[in-house]
Amino acid sequence: MKFSESWLREWVNPAVTTDELTHQITMAGLEVDDVLPVAGSFTGVKVGHVVECGQHPDADKLRVTKVDVGEEELLDIVCGAHNCRQGLKVAVATVGAVLPGDFKIKKAKLRGQPSHGMLCSFTELGIDVESDGIMELAEDAVIGTDFREFLGLDDVTVDVDLTANRADCFSIRGLAREVGVLNRADVTEPSVEAVAPSIEDKVSIEVKAPAACPRYLGRVVKNVNVQAETPLWMQEKLRRCGIRSIDPVVDITNYVLLEQGQPMHAFDLAKIEGGIVVRMAEQGEKLTLLDGSEAELNADTLVVADHNKALAIAGIFGGEESGVTTETKDVLLECAFFAPDHIRGRARSYGLHTDSSMRFERGVDYALQVSAMERATQLLVEICGGEVAPVVAVESEADLPKPNKVALRRTKLDNLLGHHIADADVVEILERLGLTVEASEEGWVAVAPTWRFDIAIEQDLIEEVGRIYGYDNIPNQNPAAALKMHNHVEADLPLKRVRDLLVDRGYHEAITYSFVEPEQQKLVVPGVEPLVLPNPISADMSAMRLGLIQGLLNTVVHNQKRQQPRVRLFEYGLRFIPCESAENGMRQEPMLAGVIAGTRGEEHWDIETNTVDFFDLKGDLEAVLELSANEKAYSFAALSPESKKANPALHPGQSAAIIVDGKEVGVIGTVHPELERKFGLNGRTIVFEIEWSAINSKVIPEAVALSKFPSNRRDIAVVVDEAVASGDIVNACLEQGGEFLKDAKLFDVYVGKGVEEGKKSLAIALTLQSLERTLEDADIAGAVDAIVAHVSEKFGAALRD
């Protein structure tokens, strides 16, 4: 929004400099982007009157003039402008004047004729106005007046970058209100009196879309002189706000737009058939706009039409056919309130961006239409003449916005601002902003004015109080946070430690959505009904996840489709389990999951490339488990296809339950081939998922004495049924080993010649040692015999020769 400082000071004139004013505006939240002078730097230019104008005797394109600038003698000036003529009021640079670019005016002769000055154009004075020839001033311009003073050129254009919520400041009226509040200064509005009708002509108005157009005003003005010249003062105000003068009717509607903040439009009355109808467009309806382009309208677009055709896109752009031209004699002035929701986005859909649409999208004061209509009528009659008809108004009270009523708590105000502002000051600030304020038990209740659509919640009021009070006036305070040592529980296993371990083992952490596709989830977690979202982002994100495996598998597919054959991922996140006894009927459980696919290692010329298998992931998971528990605390139990706990998403012969302290807390296994096909996985994929609560604590290590005596190793080979887990045999050895057995390790499994069918041979290394003495053969033999006997009794094992 660009505005002229001098125009603003006509409304409110605080005793501050330009720099102070722009700083105030910026600190109030209306950021000033730029401040530019409205004209170049020049001196010695006066208002003059061309008393005589004749042809130069020796040059066809030059004229010899005598100009009165209020001095005793007329000035002889030679001018080459085609519009120079007798009786014209002009801007005269006298001898000694300095124009922009340090151009000095001196006495001269042009083709033998003396020239003691120069008749100036806008461009020569650094004024950004498109013109052809010298300036033509109003007849009432006082001869001899300093031109800078006459046109008020000691002025600046201020460019303010308004945020989307401050539509009320898209006008001189709104900015004056703001500056008045900041400086406790009175705002002087121009006198606008109702224009008395002199004729009774009316146009019928029908609003078929009252929700989109709650108020529509129309007024006929006949016998308008559209050939009249827009006054220079109005042209200058428009120019300084970045709007080019077009014709007096358009200039007046633009002037009211800038001054009052109310967009208006003028129709050629002769081109309206039957009356005005405000309706939604018909799909595909065509309208030629004022810029000559043709718009194909959508059914959600509000239009102003007559009984046969669309005349304009409401609040956005007028139509060419009904626009005012040089032939227009009678006009219909339109002034309406269009609901922001029915204008927002429509301009962009047609590739348009107008001053009107920008204001209507953000919200126009819905109490402004009557006074804006009278202001436009007043200016139109003053400049173009005409006969005025009564205003025809159609209004839907029920569809007009209602003022927002917002409660403000004293405690909340102090808490957010971090500073106590006196009650009287709070009330004064809000009332100066136009709000109606009443006291309440907890603070106040304020009703927003009609021009403030953005005041809707308590924080909005707090912001208003803070910015008007002045953020600079709120003293700085050091944070009052108390520093204390947090109790570190050594037994807690930090998630970061697990993350670091997995990353060190070649994994990448993934974060997948908690919302999943429900039908796909049934393939991974059958038999459990998830929580279904009532308003999902999309159909494939309509259910809360029951586990992390589904998201990880989809991530593997995503990577494989992008030429990433080797994938190692892990994720920590919540699963959402329906539970009637839980809060909100849902239990949220933190889980840790991982997946591997592709080759075991990166491609290397000296290393054989092998595909990952179950034991690769099992080894990585064991490394995680060893962070939290001793070896006896966890185990893996194979799940047969017949087991009730078998997971149908996993391969029946390559999956296991994860047991911690005797409780099943997770699962590990190869993805079922059928599930691989349905997900679109490329090759073998192994996954695990475990409850984080089961592994987030660890066994605190205890320091033990190291034996100074030698250790002894004895190897045994036992034959057992193939169904017996080797881990169970090792654990049985440790159970029976007594004080001398320090370790038992499986180092070989053999099936084949010399071993009965259905059996397998397990070779186990037993390490024995004493803290007190060197073990004798009898000690070692006794321990080994006890272990063999225990294994034989428990598993039917036989010692292999």
Curated annotation (Swiss-Prot):
Chain positions recorded as Mg(2+) binding sites: D454, D460, E463, E464
GO molecular function: ATP binding; magnesium ion binding; phenylalanine-tRNA ligase activity; tRNA binding
Record-linked InterPro entries: aa-tRNA-synth_II/BPL/LPL, B3/B4_tRNA-bd, DNA-bd_dom_put_sf, Fdx_antiC-bd, Fdx_antiC-bd_sf, NA-bd_OB-fold, Phe-tRNA-ligase_IIc_bsu, Phe-tRNA-ligase_IIc_bsu_bact
GO biological process, one term: phenylalanyl-tRNA aminoacylation
Compartments where located: Cytoplasm
Keyword hit for Membrane: no
Disulfide bond residue pairs: none
Note accompanying the cofactor annotation: Binds 2 magnesium ions per tetramer.
GO-annotated cellular components: phenylalanine-tRNA ligase complex
CDD domains referenced in this protein's UniProt entry, alphabetically: PheRS_beta_core, tRNA_bind_bactPheRS
Pfam families according to UniProt: B3_4 (PF03483), B5 (PF03484), FDX-ACB (PF03147), tRNA_bind (PF01588), tRNA_synthFbeta (PF17759)
Keywords annotated in UniProt: Aminoacyl-tRNA synthetase, ATP-binding, Cytoplasm, Ligase, Magnesium, Metal-binding, Nucleotide-binding, Protein biosynthesis, RNA-binding, tRNA-binding
Ranges for domain B5: 401-476
Domain FDX-ACB: 707-800
Domain tRNA-binding: 39-148
Cofactors, names only: Mg(2+)
Enzyme nomenclature, EC number: 6.1.1.20
Reactions performed catalytically: tRNA(Phe) + L-phenylalanine + ATP = L-phenylalanyl-tRNA(Phe) + AMP + diphosphate + H(+)
Keyword tRNA-binding assigned: yes
Superkingdom of this protein's organism: Bacteria
SMART domains: B3_4, B5, FDX-ACB
Oligomeric and partner information: Tetramer of two alpha and two beta subunits.
NCBIfam families reported in the protein's UniProt record: pheT_bact, YtpR
Protein name: Phenylalanine--tRNA ligase beta subunit
